[in-house]
Amino acid sequence: MDIPHEAEAGAWGILPGFGRHHHPSSDATLFSSSLPVFPRGKLQLSDNRDGFSLIDDTAVSRTNKFNESADDFESHSIGNLLPDEEDLLTGMMDDLDLGELPDADDYDLFGSGGGMELDADFRDNLSMSGPPRLSLSSLGGNAIPQFNIPNGAGTVAGEHPYGEHPSRTLFVRNINSNVEDSELTALFEQYGDIRTLYTTCKHRGFVMISYYDIRSARMAMRSLQNKPLRRRKLDIHFSIPKDNPSEKDMNQGTLVVFNLDPSISNDDLHGIFGAHGEIKEIRETPHKRHHKFVEFYDVRGAEAALKALNRCEIAGKRIKVEPSRPGGARRSLMLQLNQDLENDDLHYLPMIGSPMANSPPMQGNWPLNSPVEGSPLQSVLSRSPVFGLSPTRNGHLSGLASALNSQGPSSKLAPIGRGQIGSNGFQQSSHLFQEPKMDNKYTGNLSPSGPLISNGGGIETLSGSEFLWGSPNARSEPSSSSVWSTSSTGNPLFSTRVDRSVPFPHQHQNQSRSHHHFHVGSAPSGVPLEKHFGFVPESSKDALFMNTVGLQGMSGMGLNGGSFSSKMANNGIINSGSMAENGFSSYRMMSSPRFSPMFLSSGLNPGRFASGFDSLYENGRPRRVENNSNQVESRKQFQLDLEKILNGEDSRTTLMIKNIPNKYTSKMLLAAIDEKNQGTYNFLYLPIDFKNKCNVGYAFINMLNPELIIPFYEAFNGKKWEKFNSEKVASLAYARIQGKSALIAHFQNSSLMNEDMRCRPIIFDTPNNPESVEQVVDEESKNMDLLDSQLSDDDGRERS
């Protein structure tokens, strides 16, 4: 039946028929914006944006008429049983507690001043359960204060996602603007020396106080938290800058030490660095023993250690010390890792809200994309007693070294570990090589059956740190190399050679460490491979025999097959004398990113390369490696042997500097050389690629006498370049053309003399050393004596 609206409106002006849906309020109600009517037992607030259910305030004509069903009557009857609005609203307004809600401006200041982060707009996410509560339950250690907004509406985390915590800087809120700076200084200085006191925003209710010692900040926070100052309770938090800290910011008090010898223990480091200040912790980086973090309690100790120990020698290696820069984690992680394992800016990657422990950064399991997955070698390697054992568990690596992913198809690297296989002194070898894109025309048929066997014990492999630092040119370009550090590539392969090495890695390292200074590979490695591999042949004939045997069996034809070897040789890929790097019969198998078939490397023709293995491929075109059994010997003639130089047995003076960053100019190179070797050379030439307007990656320098090569080697070989954030590592070798006169004769009739003066060789006159001065009578050679005008202003030496 028809029921007039006016007659049936409830006490709250709620129309019947709207009982189960929206209840528009009428003007007769107390609150026109009003709350809906619900049964008492089911009163609740929705999770909408403002914490309230939204009510449609559309006016409803009181003259409308409609049919009311039995359900509508029932709803209307229940509505009449509800309490009056005064009883209903009393408890709800108590819960709101609006008088205690914090000022929104305080939260804006707090967020901008102390590096705190709001998960969402604070004012839009307040729940009805009360104001946010600051939890400071355990501020000791690495505990982080956190604002918890009830019902999960939002959190204000006192932890910055890209920094360490707690910090040396305190963010102090609820400051009375009438407090004098001297009063603040006296209050906080009792806990330690204050580095800075920032009071510019004191009138807005907060100040920032920075200590030298992190322990002082912790103690001040514990002692002064909620203590009254001018009738206001102090609200103290650790503060970490939102933006990336600058490279000179030492607030972290943490130093990164590079190029450490693996034999240096944490106790040794503690003794060395502890002389400059009290050390809080020494952390190691997984799989990179040459790379450690030293954290000081006091930043002044870190600054003193940085100045005193940077570029000093420890255990025969020149270390590099830098401040830790946690802000660098904001860069693109995987792209950076794909380019190089050792980006110094990738020290930390914590998640927002997650506590940062004192453990080494970036620990955890990363999926390891196996470089051999899907390749024809997968089944062979999986059954091998050498390759079948991996230092990883379940295909995962922990830490930074394992974070390489598949973005770079030809730079999948995994660190090679060490460990004994059985009891025969074999060293464990993991699969560190790129995915070979193999053609049948190069490989023949690979048999998946049968183990790779060698009875030559004491095979030592490249560890992660040795691969990254001990073999510099392997890092000259991120995708330049992958390594099989075993004595065999056959299936099956039996090596009858007698092992001449020490079968234990530590003994072998001790023996080979003395060779590090005195036997330097020219290319591709600047470090002697007898440190990396377990046995050294007495002659190139030995090495050639081993290499020939090592290639057999890959075609599935057993020891006497030889198909793989012959096919590789016929295609100009393999150098029959090249498998022994620097004359050593440990094998490297490379997979070039620019060339699909595998090739077995070493013994490169020294006159045909520029820098490492990548020189085999220029602009995507393969160079043919000559099949010459004498290449091992010719390789040796370009290696630096410091022992021979000291004994006066080698009088060569012209060197080739390799792996120079392409953006370097002659001026930059001269500046780098003159830091420690000014006046020790009389000729320098940095070849320029005129098309690309950059250098070609190597240079030639002639020293005044052979003895000066030793300090030059110590200053450059195996060191990173400082400019352009380059990851290239310099290496040295003898040049083919020796002596200043021969160099001048080589260049004086070259078309190079018609190019810009900045691209020509530079000759230095050294009147204090008449033996090195050579007069050039050829008219054309006078052009060579013209110097770059830009260099003459910066260089105090006389050049003719």
Curated annotation (Swiss-Prot):
Residues 471-488 have a biased composition (Low complexity). Gene3D superfamilies: 3.30.70.330. GO terms for biological process: meiotic cell cycle; positive regulation of growth; positive regulation of meiotic nuclear division. SMART domains: RRM. Coiled coil: none annotated. Residues 470-489, 776-800 are annotated as: Disordered. Residues 168-241, 253-326 form the RRM domain. Disruption phenotype: Early flowering. GO terms for molecular function: mRNA binding. Keywords: Meiosis, Phosphoprotein, Repeat, RNA-binding. The keyword rRNA-binding does not apply. The modification Phosphoserine is found at residues 384, 390, 789, 792. Probable RNA-binding protein that plays a role in meiosis and vegetative growth. This is Protein MEI2-like 5. It comes from Arabidopsis thaliana (Mouse-ear cress). The gene is ML5.
